[in-house]
């Protein structure tokens, strides 16, 4: 990799660290090409990205970003998973790490908050933004459904009373 490519990569990573909602740092030693491809495709489906990084370049890219504190995590064969959704990248990374012991979550950052491996796991357990939006829409729709049920109830009661009168008249 020549100087221009390194400079371009540092600029790209700086943009990632400055703008990502969350960054997860992990060791990937021992993963096969197929496993890495599988992980990347899972990340893409979730709206996240997974990138193998050179430690020195990643540390340079961290300068001037809110995530400068995670520089110590970049030692050994490291990769980053990142996304705008604060739950997407951690969720996919933790699920993959459960299936494959060779992906070791080291920690990460969410904004200026440094996360250890345990915090990344807790973040992965939270519902995603889409799931939260669906729950909110459901909560908003529930009162409307109940109101419709209450409004329809008197009509149903009237029909049952009339049916009882008709049945009583036939029996007599």
Curated annotation (Swiss-Prot):
Coiled-coil region list: none
A GO molecular function held by the record: structural constituent of ribosome
Keyword Ribosomal protein recorded: yes
InterPro entries for the chain: Ribosomal_uL10, Ribosomal_uL10-like_sf, Ribosomal_uL10_bac, Ribosomal_uL10_bac_type, Ribosomal_uL10_CS_bac
PANTHER family reported for this sequence: 39S RIBOSOMAL PROTEIN L10, MITOCHONDRIAL (PTHR11560)
Function: Forms part of the ribosomal stalk, playing a central role in the interaction of the ribosome with GTP-bound translation factors.
Listed name of the protein: Large ribosomal subunit protein uL10
